[in-house]
């Protein structure tokens, strides 16, 4: 999911800022779910985020979202045969996240979930 957020940055400085903010939200979520904070620094944390952000389908979708397309329009026009894993995850976790977690603590996640669920521009 956060790779889409990072991909929406229209230049490297914006993407870098979004990467840092994404990591902060991930740290909050790990703490919220009582996970191991060291996870964030490993392959399952920033390692996976980096790989996804620089070359994955989620990042590519984020690029289209950052250019002003809705999720549905971008999927149909640019990625009709691609699986965007972040969409599937977003639809699975959104009911819980939107209902239970303080939206001010994870604004990037909340905005992206609403972008996907309600087909809004980012």
Task: Give residue ranges: language-model regions.
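NAD(P)-dependent Rossmann-like dehydrogenase/reductase catalytic/cofactor-binding core
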Residues: 2, 6, 10, 20-21, ...
